[in-house]
Amino acid sequence: NSARPSPEPRRRPAATAPVRRFGARVCRHPLCVLLLADAHDRAARGDTLQAVKVHAYHAPLTEPGSADLTAHVDFGALGKAARDAGAVVFGPVTQGAFLTSLGIQTRAKALSQASSAHVREIDEALARLTSDEGMGALFKVMALSSPGLPAPPGFE
């Protein structure tokens, strides 16, 4: 069989360094750091670099500066690095669950009532941000907090 197994996920120590610094900082000063990213609970296999231009996938190295670049974030590794530095970690939770717990539906309803001409736009944006078919499940939210602080909004 000539098929090669996919490479094991690579840990990237440089990626966790800023989180370790935040973790140490939250132990010295009462604060909370919110992380929101296209994330997973563990490292993805292979290269996850991708580009998005006008809401569509785009070749990452074509037309530099014209597209948004992203890569999957390993929230499992980041959470461990923050905990190892002494921070309290909340989440990750999906973006949809996070925004819902903050009351995004109530806000969307108020916006729609204030501007009936934009109801469709508001409904589409709400669905894109919160639905499992859109960014609601793809993006995750995690908070790093000082020990002793209450859970931040969205993580109660």
Label every PLM stretch briefly.
Residues 1-156:
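Long, Lys/Arg- and hydrophobic-enriched amphipathic alpha-helices
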